[in-house]
C-alpha cells in the first residue's frame, strides 16, 4: 500500500484500516469531523494527516494539539509504530473524543497517550517534546502561544501545522509578535492547503 506515494508495511496498512473502521463506528454517535467529509475519510483525513509524519519521519516525541478525531495525532502514532522509538501525546479536552482516541491507540497498537485537559494545562503534564502538530485548531499566532512553554524548554522545537488558503494572512499576523523560520510545503492532497514548518520560534521583544 502507498500513502501519498510512500510505501507502508502490511502491518501499518492493517492498523490504518482498523482505525478507519473504528472512526466510522464512533462517527455515528460523536461529531469527529464535518459529516460531509466522512465519506472521503482516506483522502481527506488519513492521507492528509500522514503528510505531517512524512515530513519528519524520525523517532521523536510529538505533541498533537486539539487531536479531535485523531488527525493528525493518531495517524502519526500509527506510522511511528514501525519504529523502535517515538511517542505521541494527544491533547483533547472533550471527554468523548478523548475516549475515542484512547480506544484507537490501544486497538491499533500505536505508541501514545491521551491527555483530556485544556491545551493550556498540557505543558504541566507533558514536559518535553520535539515536534508539535495541529490541524484545523486555531490561527497561527494562537498556536505559537500554546506552544510557548515547550519552546522555552527546547530551542530546537519544530511545529508542523496544516493550514488553508488564508495562511499568508495568519503568518503576517503571527510575525507581529513572533519571529520564526518558515518553510511552506504544498499539500499533496488538497490543492488549496499547505503545511507550515516552523523552527526557531521566539517571541519578539
UniProtKB/Swiss-Prot annotation:
GO terms for molecular function: rRNA (guanine-N7-)-methyltransferase activity. HAMAP family: 16SrRNA_methyltr_G (MF_00074). Its main location: cytoplasm. The keyword Cell inner membrane does not apply. NCBIfam families: rsmG_gidB (TIGR00138). PANTHER family: S-ADENOSYL-L-METHIONINE-DEPENDENT METHYLTRANSFERASES SUPERFAMILY PROTEIN. It catalyses: guanosine(527) in 16S rRNA + S-adenosyl-L-methionine = N(7)-methylguanosine(527) in 16S rRNA + S-adenosyl-L-homocysteine. InterPro entries: rRNA_ssu_MeTfrase_G, SAM-dependent_MTases_sf. It is found in: Cytoplasm. It is an enzyme of class 2 (transferase). S-adenosyl-L-methionine binds at residues 66, 71, 119-120, 135. This is Ribosomal RNA small subunit methyltransferase G.
Amino acid at each position: 500500500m502507498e500513502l501519498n506515494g510512500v510505501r507502508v508495511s502490511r502491518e501499518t496498512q492493517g492498523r490504518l484500516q482498523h482505525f478507519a473502521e473504528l472512526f466510522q463506528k464512533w462517527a455515528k454517535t460523536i461529531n469527529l469531523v464535518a459529516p460531509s467529509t466522512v465519506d472521503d475519510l482516506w483522502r481527506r483525513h488519513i492521507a492528509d494527516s500522514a503528510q505531517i509524519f512524512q515530513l519528519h519521519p524520525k523517532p521523536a516525541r510529538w505533541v498533537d494539539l486539539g487531536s479531535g478525531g485523531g488527525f493528525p495525532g493518531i495517524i502519526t502514532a500509527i506510522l511511528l509504530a514501525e519504529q523502535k522509538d517515538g511517542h505521541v501525546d494527544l491533547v483533547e479536552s472533550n471527554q468523548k473524543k478523548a475516549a475515542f482516541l484512547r480506544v484507537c491507540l490501544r486497538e491499533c497498537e500505536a505508541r501514545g497517550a491521551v491527555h483530556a485537559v485544556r491545551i493550556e494545562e498540557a505543558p504541566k503534564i507533558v514536559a518535553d517534546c520535539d515536534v508539535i502538530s495541529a490541524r484545523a485548531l486555531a490561527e497561527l499566532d494562537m498556536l505559537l502561544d500554546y506552544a510557548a512553554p515547550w519552546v522555552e524548554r527546547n530551542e530546537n522545537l519544530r511545529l508542523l501545522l496544516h493550514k488553508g488558503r488564508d495562511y499568508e494572512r495568519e503568518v503576517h499576523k503571527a510575525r507581529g509578535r513572533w519571529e520564526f523560520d518558515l518553510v511552506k510545503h504544498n499539500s499533496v492532497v488538497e490543492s488549496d492547503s499547505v503545511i507550515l514548518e516552523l523552527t526557531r520560534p521566539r517571541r519578539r521583544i
